[in-house]
């Protein structure tokens, strides 16, 4: 609209980013998204480069070849708090990608009892996706329902779909059998103290309140963070969406 010609680089084979890979079909139709993105492809001022992962070398080339570079990669690094995914332990976005893009719904039917750890919209997407495959799904969240960050409508819909909630609990240990397969989690009850930087009351573990729950699949949906080091070691965010590199936004 401002007269620029634009090149878009994406590591996936399609447009949409997290809208396409992370939002389940029951929330947003892929047919609708395909129609929206098809109209973008018709714009002669936009060129798309799919299946293209940008590393430091390619990023330096982009800086040399373009007047402006806009980085819109999102928060792709999933928090795991030291727990190693595998054998029934999954990261939230990885699960959603597996279901939404690869369509591996049949694979997850082998599980009987699911636990989703987290209280944001990604956690709700994971729980509501799994309850369509697995009958027994519960959410574990360290604060109360009052502090939960997921949309209230998502919580209501999850409950209507028989997702159970365990508030004021946090994961202390992931339990596994001799083969390494997930068998459940050791939780510890929480109590709320003074508000933290987010304005929500800070959870504190209650000593001696540990208890175990059974689960053969656990999904960690406990936040993501931005990592720009793959593009440039000195790339940092400053004020007004600018960065420490000239003409990079």
Segments (PLM) and residue ranges:
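Feature captures the FAD/FMN-dependent oxidoreductase FAD-binding
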Residues: 34-84, 173-186, 191-194, 217-219, ...
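Short acidic, glycine/proline-rich loop/turn micro-motifs
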Residues: 18-22, 83-84, 198, 231
């Amino acid at each position: 609209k401002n007269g620029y010609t634009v090149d878009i680089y994406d590591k996936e084979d399609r447009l949409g980013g997290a809208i396409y890979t992370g939002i389940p079909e029951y929330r947003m139709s892929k047919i609708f998204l395909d129609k929206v993105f098809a109209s973008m492809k018709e714009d002669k001022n936009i060129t798309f480069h799919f299946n293209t992962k940008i590393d430091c070398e390619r990023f330096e080339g982009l800086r040399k070849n373009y007047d402006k570079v806009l980085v819109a990669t999102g928060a792709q690094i999933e928090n795991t708090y030291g727990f190693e995914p595998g054998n029934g332990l999954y990261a939230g976005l990885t699960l959603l990608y597996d279901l939404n893009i690869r369509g591996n719904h049949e694979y997850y039917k082998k599980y009987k009892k699911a636990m989703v750890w987290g209280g944001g919209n990604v956690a709700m997407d994971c729980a509501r996706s799994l309850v369509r495959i697995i009958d027994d799904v519960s959410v574990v969240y360290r604060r109360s329902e009052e502090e939960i960050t997921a949309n209230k409508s998502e919580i209501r819909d999850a409950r209507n779909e028989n997702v159970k909630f365990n508030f004021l609990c946090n994961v202390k240990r992931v339990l596994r059998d001799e083969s390494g397969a997930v068998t459940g989690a050791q939780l510890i009850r929480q109590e709320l103290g003074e508000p933290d930087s987010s304005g929500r009351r800070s959870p504190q573990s209650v000593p001696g309140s540990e208890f175990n729950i059974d689960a053969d699949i656990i999904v960690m949906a406990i936040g993501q963070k931005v990592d720009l080091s793959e593009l440039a070691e000195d790339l940092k965010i400053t004020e007004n969406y600018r960065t420490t590199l000239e003409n990079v936004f």
